[in-house]
């Protein structure tokens, strides 16, 4: 009964979010040709909309005000960037790409000992490119970062260039693994096995744990002898009863991977510390893990 109650609370929260979004989307504004907003005292939204849509529009269209505000906020974050102390710089993330705002999982990546003579690493589902950049800063000479999202690929490329790391990191538009083997393969898949309701949620939800299992099941075949696969994941899904506690260990077994070490930390982001959050009962218990795995 407790399992069903907790799952119901999560799905109720998601339904309320969707209903609120539908209601807010009923109030729309007209965007004129060239992304203009012809309203009294309206801000210039051209740069924000270009960030989202790319090529400017020839004909007017209606855009929900709530979405426009989200686009403006995302554009401001894109310009400002997220400071990553371990990089000695910022990661700039546009709308539609996962932002490394909660940095505790990055600390785990910096703490884990690299495999001996780590010459080549893969970053699977690179997103903003932040994990690839951190591995480059740690001295891994050759890194291949993969993603299927064109926005993410462009974002990662721009970040690596800005940080002066583009010679160390090659980006490939492939699903999961490139056609090679590596000494280290890292992956930070979406942490919740639920269905995204919008494009912006795709980096947060992994329906059916497809990416998680795809990474684990393919890791051993892409590791060099003595190589390691690092899985970075939170246990929030377990506290929401969306994933069984034994699920990960069963996945490791199926994928012929042994756990050689586990690093963990507690999230410090706002939602984790907010007792008024609808999912506070789960977020306050959440732990983020880095599993160091080796082929059997």
Model-based region annotation:
Residues 1-82:
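N-terminal auxiliary segments of SAM/dcSAM-dependent transferases
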Residues 191-192, 209, 234-239:
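Short "lid" loop at the C-terminus of a central beta-strand within the Rossmann-like core
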Residues 102-189, 193-197:
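Conserved SAM/SAH cofactor-binding pocket of Class I
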Residues 199-224:
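Glycine-rich S-adenosyl-L-methionine
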Residues 66-115:
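Class I SAM-dependent transferase core
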Residues 226-233:
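Conserved beta-strand signature within the Rossmann-like core of class I S-adenosyl-L-methionine
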Residues 237-255:
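Short, electropositive alpha-helical surface patch
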Residues 249-295:
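Class I S-adenosyl-L-methionine
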């Amino acid at each position: 009964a407790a399992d069903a109650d907790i799952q119901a609370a999560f799905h109720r929260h998601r339904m309320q979010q969707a209903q609120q979004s539908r209601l807010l989307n009923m109030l729309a504004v007209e965007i004129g040709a060239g992304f203009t907003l012809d309203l009294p005292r309206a801000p210039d939204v051209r740069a924000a909309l270009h960030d989202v849509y790319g090529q400017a529009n020839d004909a007017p269209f209606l855009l929900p005000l709530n979405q426009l505000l989200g686009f403006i906020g995302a554009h401001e974050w894109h310009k400002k960037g997220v400071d990553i102390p371990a990089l000695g710089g910022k990661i700039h993330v546009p709308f539609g790409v996962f932002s490394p705002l909660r940095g505790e999982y990055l600390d785990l990546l910096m703490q884990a000992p690299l495999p001996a003579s780590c010459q080549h690493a893969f970053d699977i589902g690179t997103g903003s490119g932040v994990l690839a950049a951190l591995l480059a800063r740690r001295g891994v000479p050759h890194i291949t970062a993969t993603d299927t999202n064109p926005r993410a690929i462009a974002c990662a490329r721009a970040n690596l260039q800005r940080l002066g790391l583009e010679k160390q990191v090659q980006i490939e538009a492939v699903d999961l693994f490139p056609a090679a083997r590596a000494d280290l393969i890292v992956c930070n898949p979406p942490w919740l096995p639920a269905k995204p309701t919008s494009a912006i949620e795709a980096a947060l939800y992994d329906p059916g744990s497809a990416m998680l299992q795809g990474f684990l099941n393919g890791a051993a075949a892409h590791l060099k002898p003595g190589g390691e696969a690092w899985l970075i994941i939170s246990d929030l899904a377990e506290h929401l009863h969306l994933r069984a506690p034994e699920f990960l260990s069963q996945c490791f077994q199926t994928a012929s991977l042994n756990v050689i070490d586990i690093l963990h930390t507690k999230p410090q982001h706002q939602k984790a510390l907010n007792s008024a959050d609808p999912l506070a009962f789960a977020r306050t218990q959440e732990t983020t893990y880095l599993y160091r795995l080796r082929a059997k």
